Design a protein with these regions (language model features):
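Sec-dependent signal peptide recognition
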Residues: 2-10
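A generic "folded-domain core" signal
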Residues: 21-166
Length: 166
Protein backbone atom coordinates (compact mmCIF):
# COMPACT_ATOMS: atom_id res chain seq x y z
CA UNK A 1 0.00 0.00 0.00
CA UNK A 2 2.84 2.41 0.88
CA UNK A 3 4.60 1.67 -2.44
CA UNK A 4 1.39 2.45 -4.32
CA UNK A 5 1.01 5.80 -2.49
CA UNK A 6 4.64 6.74 -3.19
CA UNK A 7 4.21 5.83 -6.87
CA UNK A 8 1.03 7.92 -7.12
CA UNK A 9 2.73 10.84 -5.35
CA UNK A 10 5.67 10.60 -7.76
CA UNK A 11 3.34 10.66 -10.78
CA UNK A 12 1.48 13.64 -9.29
CA UNK A 13 4.74 15.56 -8.74
CA UNK A 14 5.92 14.87 -12.31
CA UNK A 15 2.64 16.09 -13.79
CA UNK A 16 2.62 19.13 -11.49
CA UNK A 17 6.11 20.20 -12.63
CA UNK A 18 5.08 19.62 -16.24
CA UNK A 19 2.05 21.87 -15.81
CA UNK A 20 4.16 24.55 -14.12
CA UNK A 21 6.69 24.49 -16.97
CA UNK A 22 3.92 25.46 -19.40
CA UNK A 23 2.50 28.25 -17.23
CA UNK A 24 3.45 31.67 -18.63
CA UNK A 25 5.86 33.60 -16.40
CA UNK A 26 5.84 37.40 -16.32
CA UNK A 27 9.03 39.00 -17.64
CA UNK A 28 7.94 42.58 -16.98
CA UNK A 29 4.96 44.85 -16.28
CA UNK A 30 4.83 48.19 -18.10
CA UNK A 31 1.82 50.40 -17.29
CA UNK A 32 -1.14 48.67 -19.05
CA UNK A 33 0.96 45.96 -20.72
CA UNK A 34 2.84 42.91 -19.49
CA UNK A 35 5.29 40.54 -21.18
CA UNK A 36 5.42 36.77 -20.60
CA UNK A 37 7.45 33.69 -21.49
CA UNK A 38 6.46 30.01 -21.44
CA UNK A 39 8.01 26.73 -22.54
CA UNK A 40 6.06 24.49 -24.90
CA UNK A 41 6.74 21.24 -26.75
CA UNK A 42 7.84 23.37 -29.72
CA UNK A 43 10.12 25.60 -27.65
CA UNK A 44 9.88 29.00 -26.05
CA UNK A 45 6.88 31.28 -26.60
CA UNK A 46 6.95 34.97 -25.63
CA UNK A 47 4.18 37.53 -25.77
CA UNK A 48 3.10 41.01 -24.79
CA UNK A 49 -0.47 41.19 -23.47
CA UNK A 50 -2.99 43.76 -22.30
CA UNK A 51 -6.47 43.70 -20.85
CA UNK A 52 -8.99 46.35 -21.90
CA UNK A 53 -9.45 49.47 -19.80
CA UNK A 54 -13.15 49.57 -20.77
CA UNK A 55 -15.60 46.93 -22.08
CA UNK A 56 -19.11 47.36 -23.42
CA UNK A 57 -21.89 46.41 -23.24
CA UNK A 58 -21.99 45.05 -19.72
CA UNK A 59 -25.11 43.03 -20.57
CA UNK A 60 -23.18 40.62 -22.85
CA UNK A 61 -21.86 37.64 -20.89
CA UNK A 62 -18.25 36.91 -21.88
CA UNK A 63 -14.85 35.86 -20.62
CA UNK A 64 -11.77 38.12 -20.38
CA UNK A 65 -10.75 40.14 -23.41
CA UNK A 66 -7.04 40.29 -24.30
CA UNK A 67 -4.81 41.77 -26.98
CA UNK A 68 -1.55 39.93 -27.75
CA UNK A 69 1.63 40.16 -29.81
CA UNK A 70 3.35 36.76 -29.83
CA UNK A 71 6.77 35.34 -30.75
CA UNK A 72 7.25 31.58 -31.32
CA UNK A 73 10.80 31.13 -32.65
CA UNK A 74 10.50 27.31 -32.75
CA UNK A 75 7.71 27.74 -35.31
CA UNK A 76 9.36 30.73 -37.05
CA UNK A 77 6.51 33.03 -35.94
CA UNK A 78 7.14 36.62 -34.87
CA UNK A 79 4.96 39.70 -34.43
CA UNK A 80 1.74 37.65 -34.45
CA UNK A 81 -1.10 39.97 -33.43
CA UNK A 82 -4.18 38.30 -31.95
CA UNK A 83 -7.28 39.29 -30.04
CA UNK A 84 -9.85 37.51 -27.94
CA UNK A 85 -12.94 39.38 -26.79
CA UNK A 86 -14.14 36.63 -24.49
CA UNK A 87 -16.79 35.25 -26.85
CA UNK A 88 -17.06 33.36 -30.13
CA UNK A 89 -17.01 35.75 -33.07
CA UNK A 90 -19.43 36.11 -35.91
CA UNK A 91 -17.36 35.51 -39.07
CA UNK A 92 -15.36 38.52 -40.33
CA UNK A 93 -16.71 40.84 -37.65
CA UNK A 94 -13.54 41.89 -35.78
CA UNK A 95 -11.94 45.30 -36.33
CA UNK A 96 -9.34 47.28 -34.43
CA UNK A 97 -8.87 51.01 -34.89
CA UNK A 98 -6.94 53.98 -33.62
CA UNK A 99 -7.65 57.40 -35.04
CA UNK A 100 -8.43 57.02 -38.76
CA UNK A 101 -6.57 53.69 -39.11
CA UNK A 102 -8.78 50.59 -39.09
CA UNK A 103 -7.77 46.94 -39.50
CA UNK A 104 -9.98 43.92 -40.19
CA UNK A 105 -9.17 40.59 -38.55
CA UNK A 106 -9.80 36.99 -39.58
CA UNK A 107 -11.62 35.14 -36.79
CA UNK A 108 -12.01 31.55 -35.73
CA UNK A 109 -14.14 30.74 -32.70
CA UNK A 110 -13.03 33.17 -29.95
CA UNK A 111 -9.72 34.39 -31.46
CA UNK A 112 -8.92 36.79 -34.29
CA UNK A 113 -5.70 37.46 -36.25
CA UNK A 114 -4.46 39.77 -38.96
CA UNK A 115 -4.23 38.16 -42.40
CA UNK A 116 -0.59 38.69 -43.36
CA UNK A 117 2.88 39.64 -42.12
CA UNK A 118 2.88 43.12 -43.63
CA UNK A 119 -0.44 43.99 -41.98
CA UNK A 120 1.00 42.81 -38.66
CA UNK A 121 4.09 44.99 -39.08
CA UNK A 122 1.94 48.03 -39.93
CA UNK A 123 -0.41 47.32 -37.03
CA UNK A 124 2.49 47.05 -34.56
CA UNK A 125 3.83 50.40 -35.83
CA UNK A 126 0.38 51.85 -35.13
CA UNK A 127 0.33 50.29 -31.65
CA UNK A 128 3.71 51.89 -30.85
CA UNK A 129 2.45 55.36 -31.85
CA UNK A 130 -1.11 55.15 -30.55
CA UNK A 131 -2.39 56.07 -27.11
CA UNK A 132 -5.44 53.83 -27.37
CA UNK A 133 -6.98 51.15 -29.56
CA UNK A 134 -10.64 50.18 -29.96
CA UNK A 135 -11.65 46.61 -30.83
CA UNK A 136 -15.18 46.04 -32.13
CA UNK A 137 -16.69 42.63 -32.79
CA UNK A 138 -19.97 40.77 -33.07
CA UNK A 139 -20.88 37.68 -31.11
CA UNK A 140 -22.28 34.66 -32.95
CA UNK A 141 -25.69 35.88 -31.72
CA UNK A 142 -25.14 39.31 -33.31
CA UNK A 143 -24.46 41.49 -30.25
CA UNK A 144 -21.74 44.11 -30.78
CA UNK A 145 -18.92 44.28 -28.23
CA UNK A 146 -16.40 47.09 -27.85
CA UNK A 147 -13.12 46.89 -25.94
CA UNK A 148 -10.85 49.90 -25.32
CA UNK A 149 -7.12 49.22 -24.84
CA UNK A 150 -4.51 51.66 -23.60
CA UNK A 151 -1.25 51.46 -25.52
CA UNK A 152 0.69 52.91 -22.57
CA UNK A 153 3.57 50.51 -21.94
CA UNK A 154 3.10 48.56 -25.17
CA UNK A 155 6.50 49.34 -26.70
CA UNK A 156 8.42 48.22 -23.59
CA UNK A 157 6.35 45.02 -23.21
CA UNK A 158 6.74 44.29 -26.94
CA UNK A 159 10.52 44.85 -26.84
CA UNK A 160 10.87 42.65 -23.74
CA UNK A 161 8.89 39.80 -25.32
CA UNK A 162 10.86 40.10 -28.57
CA UNK A 163 14.23 40.14 -26.76
CA UNK A 164 13.27 37.20 -24.51
CA UNK A 165 12.55 35.05 -27.57
CA UNK A 166 15.58 36.20 -29.62
Amino acid sequence: MLVKKILLLGIFVIFSFNALANTPRSTGKYKNWESFVAETEKGKICFAQSLPTKRAPKAVQRDKSKLFVTFRPGENIKDEVSITSGHDYKSSSVTASSGKKKYSFFSQKNFAWLLDDQEEKNFIKLMKRATDLIVKARTTKGAETTDHYSMMGFTKAYNTAKKTCS
